Amino acid sequence: MMAKLMITVMMVLLLSLQQGADGRSERWRKNQMAASRIMRNLITARGDPPRFCVHKICYEDSECNQWCTGGCNPTQGKCDTA
């Protein structure tokens, strides 16, 4: 786990150091956005985004992850966001 985190941090640092010269500014900007998104996810330790809740089949609320704020929808048998 620590090695994976270190690799991710190194990747983010490399993306952050890339220069936006010679017509590469758009790619550099996209890399900056990706790097900041990765760091934000690492800092907040987020799991799956909410869009994956509707695909998870469940029988009780405890089977749904933290993003499925609606818990288990008994009529559909799937996790729900609200």
Curated annotation (Swiss-Prot):
Belongs to the Pg turripeptide superfamily. Disulfide bonds join 53-68, 58-72, 64-79. This is Turripeptide Gdm9.1. Residues 1-23 form the signal peptide. It is found in: Secreted. The cysteine framework is IX (C-C-C-C-C-C). GO terms for cellular component: extracellular region. GO terms for molecular function: toxin activity. The lineage of its organism: Eukaryota, Metazoa, Spiralia, Lophotrochozoa, Mollusca.
